């Protein structure tokens, strides 16, 4: 890619995204990620609500509208061939995610954490310092706003 960039004088933005979520996400429980899975399951009135793994597993979730904003900023103002992490830069525990979804869906089931099930890397949050300092990026949405908008979108399908 770098060679092509030099040959054609093409500006190439390199983006390393975190865990995006939002409207038009994949909500198929067999193949989707944790955010749409929790939204869909909460809306199906599961009670008790069994969640695999630990509530302490932490991820850098990012609402898709902010992800797009970050990607466009890299393309418009970023240095060609320089990688930028596009994320929120903030860790959200799976337990916090669950309670944000419960709040957005207005559900209150009994929660059971099943620690015997597989889990993943305990902490995965990207530094977005370069994106903030060099390109002036700031997310427009809070995590909770993104969850609420995504939930409302899914409910209105």
Feature map (PLM): residue ranges:
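Residue-level signal for the nucleotide or nucleotide-sugar donor/cofactor binding architecture
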Residues: 29-33, 59-65, 92, 119, ...
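Non-catalytic, hydrophobic alpha-helical segments
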Residues: 67, 71, 86, 97, ...
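Amphipathic terminal alpha-helices
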Residues: 143-157
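Glycine/proline-rich active-site loop of Rossmann-fold NAD(P)-dependent oxidoreductases
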Residues: 8, 20-36, 45-48, 64-68, ...
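C-terminal "lid/loop" region of Rossmann-like NAD(P)-dependent oxidoreductases
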Residues: 54, 81-84, 92-99, 106-123, ...
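Generic alpha-helical structural context detector
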Residues: 36, 40-44, 69-73, 99, ...
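N-terminal Rossmann-like NAD(P)+-binding domain of SDR-like oxidoreductases, especially those catalyzing
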Residues: 1-26, 65, 141, 156-157
């Amino acid at each position: 890619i770098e060679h092509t960039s030099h040959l054609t004088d093409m500006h190439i933005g390199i983006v390393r995204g975190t865990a995006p979520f939002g409207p038009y996400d994949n909500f198929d429980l067999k193949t989707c990620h944790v955010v749409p899975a929790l939204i869909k399951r909460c809306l199906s009135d599961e009670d008790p609500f069994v969640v695999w793994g630990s509530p302490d597993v932490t991820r850098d979730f990012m609402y898709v509208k902010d992800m797009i904003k970050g990607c466009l900023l890299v393309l418009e103002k970023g240095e060609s061939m320089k990688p930028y992490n596009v994320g929120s830069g903030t860790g959200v525990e799976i337990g916090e995610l669950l309670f944000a979804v419960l709040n957005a869906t207005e559900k209150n089931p009994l929660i059971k954490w099943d620690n015997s099930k597989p889990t993943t890397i305990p902490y995965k949050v990207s530094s977005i310092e370069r994106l903030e300092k060099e390109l002036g990026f700031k997310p427009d949405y809070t995590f909770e706003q993104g969850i609420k908008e995504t939930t409302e979108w899914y409910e209105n399908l």
